[in-house]
């Protein structure tokens, strides 16, 4: 099994190398990751400037590793298209230092990187662990869970067209009671804008704040808050597509009314 590993915290992030350490027990690992922090870049792709790549010294011997001056999505696209010459069987993004729950997935560079594998028909995993003021203490817990999920994809126990978002409490696995398959919670954060002045110009900070704790016991946020590991199956739209229908008469009426409006100009 050949595994491309990327992230959005940068190529020297401890979470990435904790993941590599366990995934190398599953298959051949190639790292293609940003050369610097790229959090909250979502699905950003670089189109108006060249991408520069440096083969770099790995923190674990025997691993082929590339640092890219680009986004997490750039890394996976470039890795699959040019840097890795043999077919890739799995894309894994993480371990992100910070959970990716609910609508976080819409702006997550970690999830965005995994999405690029899934869009190319490669099973893909995004994995995250909470972080506060300190570095996570149990990165190996997240790495072991991800390695086991990877084995089950390899063996066919988990469908090979999977796009999975895994979040793991910062605890030893012996203290985690259960792993749950959960849907994403909706409307989990609110953005606010703070204004300041540096003596010359105004500036603004965007702040993202979590809303009150989830009370729906089926969602990923509730499960994590109660000490469970969560696995959420995603697809290219990230959230389930809402049901939206219009009768033929309604669609015709909209078009007719719009034409009438345009005729008045």
Swiss-Prot record:
Co-factor binding details: Binds 1 divalent metal cation per subunit.
Family annotation (SUPFAM superfamilies) = SurE-like
- InterPro entries assigned to the protein according to its UniProt record, in alphabetical order: SurE (IPR030048), SurE-like_Pase/nucleotidase (IPR002828), SurE-like_sf (IPR036523)
Q: Which cofactors must be present for this protein to function?
A: a divalent metal cation
Q: Does the keyword Metal-binding apply?
A: yes
Where does this protein reside within or beyond the cell?
Cytoplasm
Q: Which Gene3D superfamilies match?
A: Survival protein SurE-like phosphatase/nucleotidase
Keyword entries, A-Z: Cytoplasm, Hydrolase, Metal-binding, Nucleotide-binding
Q: What is this protein called?
A: 5'-nucleotidase SurE
The species this protein was found in: Dehalococcoides mccartyi (strain ATCC BAA-2100 / JCM 16839 / KCTC 5957 / BAV1)
User: The organism's lineage?
Assistant: Bacteria, Bacillati, Chloroflexota, Dehalococcoidia, Dehalococcoidales
> Could you tell me the gene encoding this protein?
surE
């Amino acid at each position: 099994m050949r595994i491309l590993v990327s992230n959005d915290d940068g190529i020297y992030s401890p979470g990435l190398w904790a993941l590599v350490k366990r995934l190398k027990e599953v298959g051949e690992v190639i790292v293609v990751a940003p050369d610097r922090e790229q959090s909250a870049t979502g699905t950003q792709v670089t189109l108006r400037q060249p991408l520069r790549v440096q083969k770099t010294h790995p923190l674990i011997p025997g691993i082929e590793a590339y640092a890219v001056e680009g986004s997490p999505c750039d890394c996976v696209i470039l890795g699959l298209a040019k840097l890795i010459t043999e077919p890739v069987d799995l894309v894994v993004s993480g371990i992100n230092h910070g959970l990716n729950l609910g609508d976080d997935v819409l702006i997550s560079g970690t999830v965005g990187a995994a999405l690029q594998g899934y869009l190319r028909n490669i099973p893909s995993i995004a994995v995250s662990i909470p972080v506060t003021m300190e570095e996570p203490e149990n990165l190996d817990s997240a790495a072991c869970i991800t390695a086991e999920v990877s084995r089950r994809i390899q063996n066919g126990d988990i469908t090979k067209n999977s796009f999975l978002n895994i979040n793991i409490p910062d605890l030893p696995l012996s203290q985690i009671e259960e792993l749950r398959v959960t849907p994403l919670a909706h409307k989990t954060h609110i953005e606010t804008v703070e204004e300041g002045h540096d003596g010359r110009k105004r500036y603004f900070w965007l702040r993202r704040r979590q809303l009150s704790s989830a009370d729906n016991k089926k969602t990923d946020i509730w499960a994590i808050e109660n000490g469970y590991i969560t696995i959420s199956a995603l697809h290219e739209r990230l959230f389930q597509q809402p049901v939206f229908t219009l009768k033929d008469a309604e669609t015709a009426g909209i078009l007719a009314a719009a034409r009438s409006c345009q005729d008045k100009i």
